[in-house]
Amino acid sequence: MKIYIYSEYQKWIEHSGVGRAIYHQKNAISKTKGMELAECKEDADVIHINTIFPGSVAMARWAKRHGKKVIFHAHSTEEDFRNSFIGSNAIAGLFGKWIHFCYQLGDAIVTPSEYAKKLLQKHGISESIYVMSNGIDLDYYRRQSNDRKNFRAKYGYSEKDKVIMSAGLWIRRKGILDFIEMAKRLPEYQFIWFGDSNLWSVPKEIRKAVRSQLPNLRFAGYVPKKELRQAYAGCDLFWFPTYEETEGIVVLEALAMKIPVLLRDIPVYQGWLADGQNVYTFQSQEDASSRITDICNGEIADLTDNGYQVAMERSMNQTGIHLQKIYQSALL
């Protein structure tokens, strides 16, 4: 069974969750017996589309004309488009209609969580929707002997420093304003954010906020995945204050690296992550501040082994098995 993984503007999306998900798909397919990546669309049995630009629509229509099965990957929802870039809220309704049109071109739809599936169904998408995690490469995301040392040396942190990290685009939805406010609230801890956005694309309040000059706050920008792995290994807490996700690949990476994880209590985590079992959650800045202090001071239970079990359930091996079943179902 040959699979053609299609996406547009790869250089634009490669630093995003979508870009990482595409890498995971290719990795999983190449490691799973009975599947292989097609080098061109003509050789494929299945066309797996990951983007929602006009070229993706054209690809889906071409595939239909040539008897190929189409899998549309629903990485985006109307809900997670809101509170992102300038004007996103004003056009969110139109965006929702557009992705509805795109996704319905698929013989089947794949989305990374039960929560995302419910959102798609709420907006009237009736095609077969399969839930499949974006997956995590456990062979790569594991601690290497010098990762912690290299991270701390690069950013000038001592072994005594308590370092809280997060990752994502510079957009309101990701909770970046909350992250900056927390750095002001807890000056005794070091805060570092990985990832960025073009400043022309984000609202004025975000542009102003990321220029904050705080002695305990650093914006590292986009870094290669090796350096991100070192950051996971070298920090004391992964705090993800996002307000909306379809899954959260960075959460899987943090769980795989066996570091404490603190998440906002939002619906996407229901059914697979639970407060006090494999992660900790918060509902307000006051709540988060208390949890951060408790975790950094070792005053509450270490849940990292339980968190790693969640990552294992979403390993590349499992992703490959799930993809194969989805493709086979589409070909029936």
Regions found by a protein language model. Give the residues of each.
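Conserved donor-binding/catalytic core segment of Leloir-type glycosyltransferases
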Residues: 158-174, 180-184, 192
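Short alpha-helical donor nucleotide-sugar binding micro-motif in glycosyltransferases
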Residues: 103, 222, 230-235
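Conserved acidic donor-binding segment of nucleotide-sugar-dependent glycosyltransferases
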Residues: 273-286, 293-300
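Membrane-proximal helix-turn-helix segments that form the acceptor-binding/catalytic region
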Residues: 90-109
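Aromatic "clamp/platform" in nucleotide-sugar-dependent glycosyltransferases that forms part
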Residues: 243
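Short hydrophobic beta-strand element within catalytic cores of glycosyltransferases
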Residues: 260-263
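Nucleotide-activated donor-binding/catalytic signature segment of Leloir-type glycosyltransferases, i.e.
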Residues: 204-226
